[in-house]
Amino acid sequence: MGAGDRTVAGMPRIGMGTAVQGPKPDPIRRAVLRAIEIGYRHFDTAAHYETEAPIGEAAAEAVRSGAVASRDDLFITSKLWCSDAHGDRVVPALRHTLRNLQMEYVDLYLVHWPVSMKPGRFKAPFTAEDFVPFDMRAVWEAMEECHRLGLAKAIGVANFSCKKLDTLLSFATIPPTVNQVEVNPVWQQRKLREFCRGKGIQLCAYSPLGAKGTHWGSDAVMDAGVLQDIAASRGKSVAQVCLRWVYEQGDCLIVKSFDEARMRENLDVDGWELTEEERRRIAEIPQRKINLGKRYVSDHGPYKSLEELWDGEI
């Protein structure tokens, strides 16, 4: 599996994630530029990550240096933040993202969460008063306008349950191309994958390694005994086993490392397959969702429980 392996929609199967704790523009710019030189072509960002500008700078530098022939050789995903998840704010928000990226379009624009906040609410912690009802129809109609204007080649969602996708599909004139959600061997998303496959929606995995080291991540994936046993028996790293498993599900995956050796390793999971026995053992791993989205739940907000946020699909 290489960085150039693509879905039917033209999205590279492996993307480099850029969610970081606090703004670090120069290290991100350098890491993205090196990733392009190594062979990455898909970069995942979001307004909330504050990494759009350094990605744009790295992309421009890569074109100047000849690492890629043009911006068109790259696939850039960004996301609409909750405070702009209002019908009249979506197009302006994407235009702001494009200014940050110094680009005329993004390849994929996603609704980051099925959540709306008051305009201007960008940084956690959030209060109950920050949340307002999510007008899915108005937001999606504005997302469709982004596509019609040529600002986004494709549009999609993130962190949507089967139920929310079903609601969206009931009125969408342009269906979502992608649903980006947590997927890893500890949270395998069998029901959601089957639903998306039946609707022609590409599942894209974030946190395929469990987001160890983040404020909400867990060691549960990398420390799973089954995965460690398989890795040892195959002469692979646990990360390679996880990424190979996600790849074999047909999902795209977003993986983040700014360490060059790991960036290379994350691309180099081709030329081997998990055995049926290994797949069976992974399928039996006890399931638990890692990124629960607790910050979006409030007694006074639209989602009063995790069950409501995820429609019972956790």
UniProtKB/Swiss-Prot annotation:
Domain of life: Eukaryota
Entry keyword set: Iron, NADP, Oxidoreductase
pH dependence: Optimum pH is 8-9.
Keyword Chaperone: no
Region (Disordered): 1-21
Family: Belongs to the aldo/keto reductase family.
Function: Catalyzes the reduction of a 3''-keto intermediate during the biosynthesis of 2'-deoxymugineic acid (DMA) from L-Met. Involved in the formation of phytosiderophores (MAs) belonging to the mugineic acid family and required to acquire iron.
Protein name as it appears in the record: Deoxymugineic acid synthase 1
Organism this protein belongs to: Hordeum vulgare
Lineage, highest ranks first: Eukaryota, Viridiplantae, Streptophyta, Embryophyta, Tracheophyta
